[in-house]
């Protein structure tokens, strides 16, 4: 199925590109999320009229994402208390939701889907580097310190 992308989509393309995708991916994900429209003659003409407006909107969201990333980088360190054993092993684990909640409590809104844990959930006390994907091209890094609860 041919679609016109209205936003940058990872591993697919950027704004305005006409790409071939499977019908289910287009119907169930791209179109409902507002990331694409079917590539009919009418939609192609409509898109060409609105191209500048959509590019400006995309640049605006990118700038907002970079501002959020700068705030997260400024924050630098987030401390999360958790129950742990004697050797520094946690009872349970710290996942994306816990990290997102801690960053939100520090004053910057972050959803759990934006948190990237390269080595899976955190199971030990100490310092851990975590990256936050604020936008498809904008990343921020953060140091998460897990301390044992008293």
UniProtKB/Swiss-Prot annotation:
GO terms for cellular component: ribonucleoprotein complex; ribosome. GO terms for molecular function: rRNA binding; structural constituent of ribosome. The keyword rRNA-binding applies. The keyword Secreted does not apply. This is Large ribosomal subunit protein bL9. It comes from the Bacteria. GO terms for biological process: translation. Keywords: Ribonucleoprotein, Ribosomal protein, RNA-binding, rRNA-binding. It comes from Sodalis glossinidius (strain morsitans). Belongs to the bacterial ribosomal protein bL9 family. PANTHER family: 50S RIBOSOMAL PROTEIN L9 (PTHR21368). Signal peptide: none annotated.
């Amino acid at each position: 199925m041919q679609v016109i992308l209205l936003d940058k989509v990872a591993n697919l393309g950027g704004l305005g590109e006409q790409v071939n995708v499977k019908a289910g991916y287009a119907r169930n994900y791209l179109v409902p999320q507002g990331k694409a429209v079917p590539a009919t003659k009418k939609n192609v003409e409509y898109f060409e009229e609105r191209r500048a407006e959509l590019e400006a909107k995309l640049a605006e969201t990118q700038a907002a994402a970079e501002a959020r990333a700068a705030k997260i980088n400024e924050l630098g360190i987030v401390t999360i208390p958790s129950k742990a054993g004697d050797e520094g092993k946690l009872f349970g684990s710290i996942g994306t939701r816990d990290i997102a909640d801690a960053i939100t409590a520090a004053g910057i809104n972050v959803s759990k889907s934006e948190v990237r844990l390269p080595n899976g959930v955190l199971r030990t006390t100490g310092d851990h580097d975590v990256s936050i994907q604020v936008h498809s091209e904008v990343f921020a890094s953060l140091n998460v310190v897990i301390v044992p609860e008293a």
